[in-house]
Amino acid sequence: GLERQVRLTTNIALNYVAEEKVFILNEPKHLALTWGIPLEAELETTLDNFYTKTRAYWRKWVMRTTIGQFHQEAVIRSALVLKLHQYQDTGAIIAATTTSLPESPGSTRNWDYRYCWIRDTHYTLKALNSLGHFTELQQYAHYIENIAINMGAKERFQPLYSITGDSKLVEKIMDLDGYLGEKPVRVGNQAYEHIQNDVYGQVLVSLLPLFVDLRLVEENRRDLLPMLMNILHQVEATMYEPDAGLWEFRNKAQQHSYTFLFHWAGAHAARKIAEMFRDFEMKELADKLIQQASEQLEKCFDEERGVYTQAIETKNLDASLLQLITMNYLDPNSDRAKKHVEVLEDELKTKEGLFYRYKHADDFGEPETTFLICAFWYVETLACIGRVEEAKEIFERLLTYRNHLGLLSEDVDAKTGSQWGNFPQAYSHVGLVNAAFAISKRLDTQIFL
């Protein structure tokens, strides 16, 4: 049984509730479901007051959102999803509010997403910064900062943590049927044990605004420099180490291009901070790591096809490498960048503008559904290289996959258009926001024109 009592307080006739009868609603009715201490105040007045305050809070929050005219409704909806996925006490943002909704029928790719992935930090903070919600940005950055500050100098970052920062997330299979009978139903996530070395660069990039953005800068940031130096040393220590990568392969370690990209980006962030504080030791190490990461990335370049591959010594392609352009590793105007996009399009894009993460078999076979954030990365990349009309067209096509409430899951079946995976998925909505802002920058449309 439950540790505390669950109680329903309502002014609906109790026999209707107890006997689950259908009845005609001809006046407002109120229901309060409580766990533990029951509602003791007057029902109607209390709930009307709660509703009025709640509506006012969310309307004011939306009014404070920085947003252009490009698909404003969709961006606002995604911003609300992002806000609702944040745990106010610590600032953690979970990947999704559900567990074990399958990525595709019969795939057994059923995961518990009710945790905070460090990897998502860069994308989430970028979206919050664009939306102008600095309180949420600071809360999330401080969550990451608190995890980092409590780690030992040589301790590894995990890919994910609980909303309170707990590290042990043991995966268990529950004796439940699952959504549409799709088993297994998992609680916990084994990925917390994975080696995913891109997280160090992600943390450095994510903490950068706390040092350089004048709207966010706090005094006495110098005391965090030893922590940043420890993280930079972790980049150095893991530079040549194979890992599970962005897609969390369970039985396959490689030297992933995506990891090198964030080693490169994280070292750039550290160099900016070092220059601010005239920390020559940190700057020297950052410069060395930028060079090493670039050299490793170039080992992933397939000269014959003109594309960067998923990892060193593989021909497999990966949609995450669209970000070589959006993160300015490649010059968006260069022939190399444009050819790289074309090859990824040819192999991973569907005719609907959806994108597979990759097409090769993994621990569970070949992927059957497309990954929504990859499609939004593609839109962002198109805007970046100047193919703005195509970016707009595909963005608008992606909006058609939302449900009647404007919500997106993790995956879409390209053949049927059905949504799969945990829902709603913060990653997908972050992708929507960042893609919309990338297009808006290119359009530069004034509201009065």
Residues of each region from the PLM?
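Acidic, mature catalytic/reactive cores of soluble proteins
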Residues: 1-449
